[in-house]
Amino acid sequence: MKCPECVSENQIKYISEFYQNMENALYSKDGYTTDSKGERHALSDYIDIESLARMYLLQEFSMNLDSGITSFYLYKDSDLTGDGKLHAAPVWDFDVALGNYTSRNGTDFTDPTQWWAKISRMYDNSSKYNVMAQAVQHEEVWNKVKELWQSEFMPAIKYILGESTAYTATKIKTLDAY
């Protein structure tokens, strides 16, 4: 836990149990877990699926070696004033992304047809999937990834490349603008 700096033991216990329940659902085959009260909960009860899908797309598109392993942040909305879920954000640390690293565990980062975030393991090829790779093993997350790829990422990419004028962004410029 990065912040806040000063927290009570009860708060640490609460967030630890919450995160553990999220991981239990994440690493389960069906995306569900049973909490300490005996109640069954879905992965989507613990983490915002859309923010997770957006983070996945950004990590995969950039072929970020750190995807879901290090420099991967989540924040939790308040149970009282927010949705009470974890959210994947902010994006951070792309020093070994976008071609700054050539290979790891047999994955060639210079090959644009390779998956990385989808198959990334914690330490080596024999360890379990990291958070990002495990998330997209669940149909709910993978379907959201596909939806966002078609509805937002591809239109933005086509706009940047000058292949489409249909994208209406104020902060994104085409390559011709540079």
Where do the model's predicted regions map?
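Active-site acidic catalytic loop and adjacent metal/ATP-binding pocket
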Residues: 45-101
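Intrinsically disordered or highly flexible coil/loop and linker segments, enriched in small
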Residues: 28-32, 62-67, 141, 154-159
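ATP-dependent phospho-/nucleotidyl transfer catalytic cores
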Residues: 1-62
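C-terminal catalytic region of ATP-dependent kinase domains
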Residues: 2-12, 16-19, 23, 36, ...
